[in-house]
Amino acid sequence: MSKAKFERTKPHVNIGTIGHVDHGKTTLTAAITQTMAARGLAEFKAFDQIDNAPEERERGITIATAHVEYQTDTRHYAHVDCPGHADYVKNMITGAAQMDGAILVVSAADGPMPQTREHILLARQVGVPAMVVFLNKADMVDDEELMELVELEVRELLSSYDFPGDDIPIVAGSALKALECGCGKDDCDACKPIIELMNQVDTYIPEPERDIDKPFLMPVEDVFSISGRGTVATGRVESGIVCVQDEIEIVGMKETTKTVVTGVEMFRKLLDQGQAGDNIGVLLRGVKREDIERGQVLAKPGSITPHTKFKAEAYILTKEEGGRHTPFFNGYRPQFYFRTTDVTGICELAEGTEMVMPGDNASMTVNLITPIAMDKELRFAIREGGRTVGAGVVSEVIE
């Protein structure tokens, strides 16, 4: 089969398999690529091609992740699968592989297990918007009532973490049987569950809002003044569009102020607008060089606010990853690196947590000494004197 052309016409969605070790995440990933390949919509990736995932470094953290891609009739998917539990934790917290949705794999023979629970919690904390469930190894359960019990258990578990457990689609099947058959036909007992699963993913997981459609936001990287013209802030536009004459806010570090964009330039050329992904300079009306600094953001008025206190999920690097050699305790005071700047913060560990060891993931409440423009799901690094010792994500803004 010739390599499927990357269709720009189909919406693109990032997805991943999550769930307990040995419940069949990688087998399912292989089965999906094979079923879609049989339908002319993907290139087949075998189990061991996916399982021997290369290690990547994201913010100094080593993560093994396999990336596969395939299409359905309506969408183009990039799918991530991680070989180890620790890789999932790191991946979800750092946002290394952005997930617009997830396929939760649960073995029908075992039911939900500790990592099933942990992955659902992480998905909730880091803001994975929706998931679909695949009850794998259904061929090993011949008792209809037992299947129903497992399904009920999964739904209750999802509901307990604020996912709509009653509405989430659950598809039962055997990834291994589908992989062994590989015909990809609608009427095949082995392959049908995979096709049904992908139909559910197509319809139930919402299409992500593109960065360009979100409100304008640009983290300030550098500031300089141009004599006779005013002050220019430079940076990469994170989301949205900014046009000349737009009113914007400067948010974070100090009092929020309003100003008007009097010019946008890119590669020394003047433009009418800048958009998500562009590296631009923004000329600001009536703003002094000292009124604005790295670490602030330019944003659409009212779209983002500065905060000092938030809850977070964090992963703390191991010694081998270049992190700390010792645990830390309540009251730990590292720097939190948001977008373009470090801010000192004080960590309050979750109740019942005495200390956090290198290699742990932890829930904590953080108090920053300076306010930063933030929203739920904002990623950050934890640093000590410029060295990264952890990575985290804002799970809730408090004040």
UniProtKB/Swiss-Prot annotation:
Its main location: cytoplasm. Residues 136-139 are annotated as: G4. GO terms for molecular function: GTP binding; GTPase activity; translation elongation factor activity. It comes from Syntrophotalea carbinolica (strain DSM 2380 / NBRC 103641 / GraBd1) (Pelobacter carbinolicus). Belongs to the TRAFAC class translation factor GTPase superfamily. Classic translation factor GTPase family. EF-Tu/EF-1A subfamily. Monomer. Residues 174-176 are annotated as: G5. SUPFAM superfamilies: EF-Tu/eEF-1alpha/eIF2-gamma C-terminal domain, P-loop containing nucleoside triphosphate hydrolases, Translation proteins. It is found in: Cytoplasm. This is Elongation factor Tu 1. Signal peptide: none annotated. Mg(2+) binds at residue 26. Residues 10-209 form the tr-type G domain. The keyword Ribosomal protein does not apply. GO terms for cellular component: cytosol. It holds the Pfam family GTP_EFTU_D2. It catalyses: GTP + H2O = GDP + phosphate + H(+). It is an enzyme of class 3 (hydrolase). The gene is tuf1. Gene3D superfamilies: P-loop containing nucleotide triphosphate hydrolases, Translation factors. Residues 81-84 are annotated as: G3. Keywords: Cytoplasm, Elongation factor, GTP-binding, Hydrolase, Magnesium, Metal-binding, Nucleotide-binding, Protein biosynthesis. GTP binds at residues 19-26, 81-85, 136-139. Its EC number is 3.6.5.3. Residues 60-64 are annotated as: G2.
